[in-house]
Protein backbone atom coordinates (compact mmCIF):
# COMPACT_ATOMS: atom_id res chain seq x y z
CA UNK A 1 0.00 0.00 0.00
CA UNK A 2 2.02 2.90 -1.30
CA UNK A 3 0.13 5.62 0.52
CA UNK A 4 -1.17 4.07 3.71
CA UNK A 5 -0.87 1.50 6.38
CA UNK A 6 -1.99 -2.05 6.85
CA UNK A 7 -4.67 -2.73 9.39
CA UNK A 8 -3.86 -4.25 12.73
CA UNK A 9 -4.56 -7.98 12.39
CA UNK A 10 -7.83 -9.09 13.89
CA UNK A 11 -7.31 -11.34 16.86
CA UNK A 12 -7.70 -11.78 20.56
CA UNK A 13 -5.04 -11.06 23.15
CA UNK A 14 -4.95 -12.52 26.63
CA UNK A 15 -3.46 -10.60 29.50
CA UNK A 16 0.12 -11.82 30.04
CA UNK A 17 -0.75 -12.95 33.54
CA UNK A 18 -3.29 -15.36 32.09
CA UNK A 19 -0.69 -16.73 29.70
CA UNK A 20 1.75 -17.12 32.59
CA UNK A 21 -0.49 -19.14 34.90
CA UNK A 22 0.58 -22.64 35.82
CA UNK A 23 -1.16 -25.22 37.97
CA UNK A 24 1.09 -24.76 40.98
CA UNK A 25 3.51 -22.15 42.24
CA UNK A 26 2.86 -19.56 39.56
CA UNK A 27 3.83 -16.65 41.75
CA UNK A 28 7.10 -18.25 42.84
CA UNK A 29 8.19 -19.77 39.55
CA UNK A 30 6.15 -18.26 36.71
CA UNK A 31 5.92 -20.03 33.37
CA UNK A 32 9.20 -19.84 31.51
CA UNK A 33 11.32 -19.42 34.64
CA UNK A 34 12.45 -22.64 36.25
CA UNK A 35 14.53 -20.78 38.83
CA UNK A 36 15.28 -17.15 39.56
CA UNK A 37 19.01 -16.46 39.37
CA UNK A 38 20.99 -16.28 42.57
CA UNK A 39 22.42 -12.87 43.32
CA UNK A 40 20.81 -9.44 43.22
CA UNK A 41 17.56 -8.24 41.67
CA UNK A 42 16.98 -4.71 40.38
CA UNK A 43 13.67 -2.97 39.84
CA UNK A 44 13.23 -1.06 36.55
CA UNK A 45 13.02 2.29 38.36
CA UNK A 46 14.62 5.67 37.76
CA UNK A 47 16.94 5.17 40.72
CA UNK A 48 18.58 2.22 38.97
CA UNK A 49 18.43 3.16 35.29
CA UNK A 50 17.53 5.83 32.78
CA UNK A 51 14.01 5.30 31.47
CA UNK A 52 13.03 6.98 28.22
CA UNK A 53 9.75 6.84 26.37
CA UNK A 54 6.33 6.56 27.95
CA UNK A 55 5.98 3.69 30.40
CA UNK A 56 3.12 2.29 32.50
CA UNK A 57 3.71 0.64 35.86
CA UNK A 58 1.13 -2.00 36.76
CA UNK A 59 0.90 -4.42 39.67
CA UNK A 60 -0.40 -7.86 38.72
CA UNK A 61 -3.56 -8.93 40.54
CA UNK A 62 -2.49 -12.58 40.65
CA UNK A 63 1.18 -12.16 41.46
CA UNK A 64 1.38 -8.84 43.30
CA UNK A 65 4.46 -8.01 41.24
CA UNK A 66 5.09 -4.71 39.51
CA UNK A 67 5.91 -4.54 35.83
CA UNK A 68 7.07 -1.47 33.95
CA UNK A 69 5.56 -1.63 30.47
CA UNK A 70 7.49 0.03 27.67
CA UNK A 71 4.68 1.66 25.74
CA UNK A 72 5.54 3.07 22.32
CA UNK A 73 8.18 1.96 19.83
CA UNK A 74 11.68 3.05 20.72
CA UNK A 75 11.06 3.17 24.49
CA UNK A 76 14.06 1.90 26.40
CA UNK A 77 15.97 1.54 29.65
CA UNK A 78 19.69 2.21 29.87
CA UNK A 79 22.26 1.81 32.61
CA UNK A 80 25.92 1.27 33.32
CA UNK A 81 26.50 -2.29 34.45
CA UNK A 82 29.50 -3.57 36.38
CA UNK A 83 29.43 -7.29 37.07
CA UNK A 84 29.65 -10.77 35.59
CA UNK A 85 26.11 -11.79 34.62
CA UNK A 86 22.90 -9.99 33.70
CA UNK A 87 19.43 -11.22 32.80
CA UNK A 88 15.99 -9.65 32.53
CA UNK A 89 12.54 -10.97 33.42
CA UNK A 90 9.96 -9.76 30.91
CA UNK A 91 6.23 -10.26 30.52
CA UNK A 92 4.56 -10.12 27.11
CA UNK A 93 1.71 -11.24 24.87
CA UNK A 94 1.13 -11.09 21.14
CA UNK A 95 -1.61 -10.52 18.60
CA UNK A 96 -2.60 -13.44 16.39
CA UNK A 97 -4.30 -13.02 13.02
CA UNK A 98 -7.52 -15.02 13.09
CA UNK A 99 -7.50 -15.53 9.33
CA UNK A 100 -4.12 -17.23 8.92
CA UNK A 101 -2.73 -17.69 12.43
CA UNK A 102 0.19 -15.30 11.92
CA UNK A 103 1.65 -14.21 15.24
CA UNK A 104 3.02 -10.74 15.94
CA UNK A 105 5.33 -10.94 18.98
CA UNK A 106 7.12 -7.99 20.51
CA UNK A 107 10.71 -7.52 19.32
CA UNK A 108 13.42 -6.13 21.58
CA UNK A 109 16.92 -4.88 20.80
CA UNK A 110 19.93 -5.19 23.09
CA UNK A 111 22.83 -2.73 22.89
CA UNK A 112 26.11 -3.16 24.75
CA UNK A 113 28.35 -0.09 24.79
CA UNK A 114 26.08 1.45 22.12
CA UNK A 115 26.55 -1.47 19.72
CA UNK A 116 23.60 -3.58 18.64
CA UNK A 117 24.33 -7.19 19.58
CA UNK A 118 20.93 -8.85 19.45
CA UNK A 119 17.28 -8.53 18.32
CA UNK A 120 14.92 -11.07 19.81
CA UNK A 121 11.19 -11.79 20.08
CA UNK A 122 9.39 -12.11 23.39
CA UNK A 123 7.29 -15.16 24.17
CA UNK A 124 3.87 -14.80 25.82
CA UNK A 125 3.88 -14.95 29.58
CA UNK A 126 6.79 -14.27 31.93
CA UNK A 127 10.24 -15.41 30.87
CA UNK A 128 13.83 -14.85 31.85
CA UNK A 129 16.10 -13.58 29.06
CA UNK A 130 19.89 -13.67 29.46
CA UNK A 131 21.44 -10.35 28.43
CA UNK A 132 25.01 -10.95 29.51
CA UNK A 133 25.48 -14.63 30.36
CA UNK A 134 28.31 -15.49 32.69
CA UNK A 135 31.24 -17.55 31.47
CA UNK A 136 29.92 -19.08 28.24
CA UNK A 137 28.78 -15.70 26.96
CA UNK A 138 30.32 -16.01 23.51
CA UNK A 139 28.25 -19.08 22.61
CA UNK A 140 24.93 -18.66 20.81
CA UNK A 141 23.20 -21.14 23.15
CA UNK A 142 23.81 -18.74 26.02
CA UNK A 143 21.26 -16.32 24.52
CA UNK A 144 18.32 -18.73 24.72
CA UNK A 145 15.69 -17.84 27.30
CA UNK A 146 14.37 -20.43 29.72
CA UNK A 147 11.23 -22.12 28.40
CA UNK A 148 9.77 -25.31 29.88
CA UNK A 149 8.44 -26.39 26.48
CA UNK A 150 11.88 -26.35 24.93
CA UNK A 151 11.31 -23.50 22.48
CA UNK A 152 14.17 -21.06 22.28
CA UNK A 153 14.00 -17.31 21.77
CA UNK A 154 17.46 -16.83 20.39
CA UNK A 155 16.65 -14.07 17.93
CA UNK A 156 19.19 -12.35 15.75
CA UNK A 157 22.61 -12.34 17.40
CA UNK A 158 25.06 -9.78 16.07
CA UNK A 159 28.79 -10.38 16.39
CA UNK A 160 30.65 -8.26 18.91
CA UNK A 161 34.29 -9.19 19.33
CA UNK A 162 34.59 -8.09 22.96
CA UNK A 163 31.15 -9.29 24.05
CA UNK A 164 32.42 -11.57 26.77
CA UNK A 165 35.33 -9.48 27.95
CA UNK A 166 37.58 -11.46 30.26
CA UNK A 167 35.94 -14.68 31.41
CA UNK A 168 38.07 -14.84 34.53
CA UNK A 169 35.95 -15.09 37.67
CA UNK A 170 38.25 -12.52 39.23
CA UNK A 171 37.35 -9.76 36.77
CA UNK A 172 34.19 -7.68 36.58
CA UNK A 173 33.02 -6.16 33.32
CA UNK A 174 31.76 -2.59 32.98
CA UNK A 175 29.58 -1.58 30.06
CA UNK A 176 26.54 0.46 29.08
CA UNK A 177 23.45 -1.73 28.61
CA UNK A 178 20.43 -0.53 26.65
CA UNK A 179 17.24 -2.57 26.16
CA UNK A 180 14.87 -1.16 23.53
CA UNK A 181 11.33 -1.99 22.49
CA UNK A 182 11.44 -2.19 18.69
CA UNK A 183 7.83 -2.97 17.75
CA UNK A 184 4.41 -1.50 18.55
CA UNK A 185 2.03 -1.99 21.43
CA UNK A 186 -0.86 -2.67 19.05
CA UNK A 187 0.87 -5.95 18.17
CA UNK A 188 2.39 -6.97 21.51
CA UNK A 189 3.27 -5.59 24.92
CA UNK A 190 6.54 -5.69 26.84
CA UNK A 191 6.76 -5.30 30.60
CA UNK A 192 9.99 -5.39 32.58
CA UNK A 193 9.63 -7.13 35.94
CA UNK A 194 13.25 -7.13 37.11
CA UNK A 195 16.89 -7.39 36.16
CA UNK A 196 19.05 -10.04 37.84
CA UNK A 197 22.80 -9.87 38.38
CA UNK A 198 25.54 -11.64 40.27
CA UNK A 199 25.96 -10.67 43.92
CA UNK A 200 28.86 -8.27 43.33
CA UNK A 201 27.27 -6.40 40.42
CA UNK A 202 26.25 -2.76 40.40
CA UNK A 203 23.77 -0.92 38.18
CA UNK A 204 23.47 2.85 37.89
CA UNK A 205 21.61 5.16 35.50
CA UNK A 206 23.42 6.68 32.55
CA UNK A 207 23.52 10.47 32.38
CA UNK A 208 20.68 12.44 30.86
CA UNK A 209 21.50 14.32 27.68
CA UNK A 210 21.21 18.07 27.14
CA UNK A 211 19.06 17.75 24.03
CA UNK A 212 15.56 16.30 24.21
CA UNK A 213 13.25 15.56 21.27
CA UNK A 214 9.76 14.11 21.05
CA UNK A 215 8.50 12.51 17.83
CA UNK A 216 4.79 12.11 17.09
CA UNK A 217 3.94 9.98 14.09
CA UNK A 218 2.57 6.96 12.31
CA UNK A 219 4.09 3.80 10.85
CA UNK A 220 6.90 5.72 9.16
CA UNK A 221 8.07 6.87 12.59
CA UNK A 222 7.63 3.34 13.98
CA UNK A 223 9.87 1.84 11.30
CA UNK A 224 7.05 -0.32 9.92
CA UNK A 225 8.49 -2.88 7.49
CA UNK A 226 11.85 -1.13 7.36
CA UNK A 227 13.77 -4.42 7.65
CA UNK A 228 11.63 -6.15 5.03
CA UNK A 229 11.46 -6.17 1.24
CA UNK A 230 8.63 -5.21 -1.13
CA UNK A 231 7.67 -8.85 -1.60
CA UNK A 232 7.55 -9.55 2.16
CA UNK A 233 4.37 -9.54 4.18
CA UNK A 234 4.65 -7.35 7.25
CA UNK A 235 5.65 -8.96 10.51
CA UNK A 236 6.98 -7.45 13.71
CA UNK A 237 10.32 -8.99 12.79
CA UNK A 238 10.49 -6.41 9.97
CA UNK A 239 9.60 -3.47 12.23
CA UNK A 240 12.38 -1.49 13.87
CA UNK A 241 12.05 1.92 15.48
CA UNK A 242 15.84 2.04 15.75
CA UNK A 243 16.14 1.88 11.95
CA UNK A 244 13.59 4.65 11.37
CA UNK A 245 14.32 8.33 10.81
CA UNK A 246 13.25 9.58 14.26
CA UNK A 247 15.57 7.48 16.41
CA UNK A 248 18.42 7.86 13.92
CA UNK A 249 18.00 11.63 13.97
CA UNK A 250 17.93 11.76 17.77
CA UNK A 251 21.04 9.63 18.05
CA UNK A 252 22.87 11.75 15.49
CA UNK A 253 22.06 14.79 17.62
CA UNK A 254 23.05 12.98 20.83
CA UNK A 255 19.58 13.65 22.20
CA UNK A 256 17.31 11.88 24.64
CA UNK A 257 14.07 11.11 22.86
CA UNK A 258 10.64 9.59 23.11
CA UNK A 259 8.22 8.44 20.42
CA UNK A 260 4.44 8.62 20.42
CA UNK A 261 3.79 6.71 17.21
CA UNK A 262 1.22 4.22 15.99
CA UNK A 263 0.86 2.58 12.58
CA UNK A 264 -2.23 3.56 10.63
CA UNK A 265 -3.02 6.56 12.81
CA UNK A 266 -4.05 10.02 11.70
CA UNK A 267 -5.53 13.32 12.83
CA UNK A 268 -9.11 12.83 11.57
CA UNK A 269 -8.97 9.25 10.28
CA UNK A 270 -6.89 6.12 10.45
CA UNK A 271 -5.97 4.42 7.19
CA UNK A 272 -9.01 3.13 5.28
CA UNK A 273 -9.19 0.95 2.18
CA UNK A 274 -10.12 2.58 -1.17
CA UNK A 275 -13.55 0.92 -1.20
CA UNK A 276 -14.42 2.44 2.18
CA UNK A 277 -15.84 5.95 2.47
CA UNK A 278 -16.27 6.64 6.18
CA UNK A 279 -13.40 7.79 8.41
CA UNK A 280 -11.98 5.33 10.91
CA UNK A 281 -11.86 7.21 14.20
CA UNK A 282 -11.40 4.60 16.93
CA UNK A 283 -7.76 5.57 17.54
CA UNK A 284 -6.65 9.09 16.57
CA UNK A 285 -3.49 10.88 17.63
CA UNK A 286 -5.03 14.01 19.23
CA UNK A 287 -6.77 11.81 21.82
CA UNK A 288 -4.01 9.19 22.12
CA UNK A 289 -1.38 11.86 22.83
CA UNK A 290 -3.00 12.90 26.12
CA UNK A 291 -2.63 9.48 27.76
CA UNK A 292 0.43 7.46 28.67
CA UNK A 293 -0.81 4.51 26.62
CA UNK A 294 -4.57 4.34 26.16
CA UNK A 295 -4.32 1.36 23.80
CA UNK A 296 -2.51 -0.84 26.32
CA UNK A 297 -4.87 0.26 29.09
CA UNK A 298 -7.94 -0.55 27.01
CA UNK A 299 -6.59 -3.97 26.03
CA UNK A 300 -6.24 -5.07 29.64
CA UNK A 301 -9.16 -3.17 31.14
CA UNK A 302 -7.02 -0.70 33.07
CA UNK A 303 -8.07 2.87 33.73
CA UNK A 304 -6.34 5.16 31.19
CA UNK A 305 -3.54 7.18 32.77
CA UNK A 306 -3.13 10.85 31.83
CA UNK A 307 0.38 11.55 30.64
CA UNK A 308 2.49 13.75 32.93
CA UNK A 309 3.92 16.26 30.48
CA UNK A 310 6.36 17.55 33.10
CA UNK A 311 8.17 14.20 33.12
CA UNK A 312 9.78 14.83 29.72
CA UNK A 313 10.23 18.42 28.52
CA UNK A 314 11.57 18.41 24.96
CA UNK A 315 13.20 21.36 23.23
CA UNK A 316 11.70 20.09 19.97
CA UNK A 317 8.52 18.21 19.07
CA UNK A 318 8.55 16.69 15.57
CA UNK A 319 5.17 15.82 14.04
CA UNK A 320 4.87 13.38 11.14
CA UNK A 321 1.15 12.92 10.44
CA UNK A 322 -1.19 13.08 7.43
CA UNK A 323 -0.31 10.04 5.34
CA UNK A 324 -3.21 8.00 6.69
CA UNK A 325 -5.63 10.93 6.69
CA UNK A 326 -5.00 11.15 2.95
CA UNK A 327 -6.57 7.71 2.50
CA UNK A 328 -9.82 9.37 3.64
CA UNK A 329 -9.53 12.97 2.39
CA UNK A 330 -8.65 11.85 -1.19
CA UNK A 331 -8.43 15.39 -2.51
CA UNK A 332 -12.01 16.20 -1.43
CA UNK A 333 -12.02 19.87 -0.43
CA UNK A 334 -14.35 19.63 2.57
CA UNK A 335 -12.39 16.74 4.04
CA UNK A 336 -9.06 18.47 3.48
CA UNK A 337 -10.34 21.64 5.13
CA UNK A 338 -11.42 19.64 8.15
CA UNK A 339 -8.01 17.97 8.27
CA UNK A 340 -6.29 21.36 8.24
CA UNK A 341 -8.46 22.71 11.06
CA UNK A 342 -7.98 19.64 13.25
CA UNK A 343 -4.26 19.59 12.49
CA UNK A 344 -3.99 23.22 13.63
CA UNK A 345 -5.88 22.49 16.82
CA UNK A 346 -3.67 19.50 17.59
CA UNK A 347 -0.50 21.56 17.13
CA UNK A 348 -1.93 24.25 19.41
CA UNK A 349 -2.61 21.60 22.04
CA UNK A 350 0.94 20.27 21.71
CA UNK A 351 2.20 23.82 22.25
CA UNK A 352 0.02 24.24 25.34
CA UNK A 353 1.35 20.98 26.78
CA UNK A 354 4.98 21.74 25.82
CA UNK A 355 5.27 25.55 26.09
CA UNK A 356 9.06 25.51 25.96
CA UNK A 357 9.35 23.43 22.79
CA UNK A 358 9.82 24.39 19.18
CA UNK A 359 7.52 22.41 16.89
CA UNK A 360 8.58 20.99 13.53
CA UNK A 361 6.01 19.59 11.10
CA UNK A 362 7.48 17.22 8.54
CA UNK A 363 5.65 15.48 5.72
CA UNK A 364 5.80 14.20 2.17
CA UNK A 365 7.86 11.02 1.86
CA UNK A 366 4.94 8.66 1.03
CA UNK A 367 2.17 11.06 0.09
CA UNK A 368 2.13 14.62 -1.26
CA UNK A 369 -1.57 15.34 -1.60
CA UNK A 370 -2.02 16.88 1.87
CA UNK A 371 1.33 18.70 1.83
CA UNK A 372 -0.23 22.08 0.89
CA UNK A 373 -2.67 21.72 3.79
CA UNK A 374 0.12 20.98 6.26
CA UNK A 375 2.12 23.93 4.95
CA UNK A 376 -0.90 26.23 5.20
CA UNK A 377 -1.53 25.06 8.75
CA UNK A 378 2.08 25.78 9.71
CA UNK A 379 1.90 29.27 8.21
CA UNK A 380 -1.34 30.08 10.03
CA UNK A 381 0.00 28.80 13.32
CA UNK A 382 3.28 30.66 12.97
CA UNK A 383 1.47 33.92 12.25
CA UNK A 384 -0.60 33.40 15.40
CA UNK A 385 2.51 33.07 17.56
CA UNK A 386 2.95 29.30 17.77
CA UNK A 387 6.68 28.42 17.44
CA UNK A 388 6.31 26.03 14.52
CA UNK A 389 8.38 25.35 11.39
CA UNK A 390 7.85 23.28 8.25
CA UNK A 391 10.24 20.62 6.99
CA UNK A 392 9.41 19.19 3.58
CA UNK A 393 10.48 15.63 2.97
CA UNK A 394 11.82 14.38 -0.32
CA UNK A 395 9.18 12.04 -1.79
CA UNK A 396 10.11 8.49 -2.68
CA UNK A 397 10.58 8.40 -6.47
CA UNK A 398 8.60 5.90 -8.56
CA UNK A 399 10.32 2.54 -8.71
CA UNK A 400 12.34 2.99 -5.53
CA UNK A 401 12.86 -0.23 -3.61
CA UNK A 402 10.79 -0.08 -0.45
CA UNK A 403 10.26 -2.03 2.72
CA UNK A 404 7.02 -3.91 3.40
CA UNK A 405 3.74 -2.52 2.01
CA UNK A 406 5.39 0.35 0.17
CA UNK A 407 6.90 1.85 3.30
CA UNK A 408 10.32 3.53 3.35
CA UNK A 409 13.30 1.21 3.23
CA UNK A 410 16.23 1.47 5.62
CA UNK A 411 18.08 3.51 3.01
CA UNK A 412 15.19 5.96 2.60
CA UNK A 413 14.75 6.25 6.37
CA UNK A 414 18.44 7.09 6.64
CA UNK A 415 18.07 9.87 4.06
CA UNK A 416 15.08 11.21 5.98
CA UNK A 417 17.13 11.21 9.19
CA UNK A 418 20.02 13.04 7.53
CA UNK A 419 17.70 15.70 6.14
CA UNK A 420 15.88 16.26 9.43
CA UNK A 421 19.13 16.28 11.41
CA UNK A 422 20.54 19.02 9.20
CA UNK A 423 17.30 21.00 9.46
CA UNK A 424 17.23 20.83 13.27
CA UNK A 425 20.88 21.85 13.52
CA UNK A 426 20.29 24.89 11.33
CA UNK A 427 16.90 25.94 12.68
CA UNK A 428 16.78 24.84 16.33
CA UNK A 429 20.15 23.86 17.75
CA UNK A 430 22.15 26.71 16.20
CA UNK A 431 23.80 27.87 19.42
CA UNK A 432 25.21 24.46 20.33
CA UNK A 433 25.99 23.34 16.79
CA UNK A 434 29.04 21.09 16.53
CA UNK A 435 30.84 20.04 13.37
CA UNK A 436 30.62 16.37 14.32
CA UNK A 437 26.80 16.49 14.58
CA UNK A 438 26.03 14.17 11.70
CA UNK A 439 24.99 10.63 10.96
CA UNK A 440 28.14 8.59 10.51
Model-inferred region functions:
Residues 365-440:
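Catalytic His-Asp segment of secreted/periplasmic serine-dependent ester chemistry enzymes
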Residues 212-216, 221, 257-261, 315-320, ...:
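Structural recognition of the beta-strand scaffold that forms the well-ordered cores
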Residues 226, 231-333, 337, 365-375, ...:
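Conserved SGNH/GDSL esterase-like catalytic core that processes O-acyl groups on lipids
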Residues 339, 343, 413:
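Aromatic/hydrophobic pocket-lining residues that form the small-molecule binding cavity
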Residues 1-4, 31-143, 149, 154, ...:
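N-terminal secretory targeting modules
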Residues 343-347, 375:
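Generic structural signal for well-ordered alpha-helices
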Residues 246-256, 349-358, 378-385:
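A structural motif corresponding to the C-terminal end of an alpha-helix
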Residues 320-322, 347-349, 359-361, 367-370, ...:
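Conserved, well-ordered alpha-helix/loop/beta-strand core segments that scaffold catalytic motifs
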Amino acid sequence: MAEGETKRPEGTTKHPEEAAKSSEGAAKHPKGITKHPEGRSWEPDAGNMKILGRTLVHTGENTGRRARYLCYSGSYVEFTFTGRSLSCELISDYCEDQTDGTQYPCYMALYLDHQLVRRFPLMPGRHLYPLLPEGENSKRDAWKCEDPEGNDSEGDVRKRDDLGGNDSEEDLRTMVVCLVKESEVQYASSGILAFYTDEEAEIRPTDKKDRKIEFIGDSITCGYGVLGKPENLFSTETESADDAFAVQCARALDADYQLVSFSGIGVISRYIEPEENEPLTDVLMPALYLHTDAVLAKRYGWRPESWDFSSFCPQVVVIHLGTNDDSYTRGIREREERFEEEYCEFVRNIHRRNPGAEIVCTFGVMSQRLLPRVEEAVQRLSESGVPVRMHREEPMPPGEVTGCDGHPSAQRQRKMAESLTGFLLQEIFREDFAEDDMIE
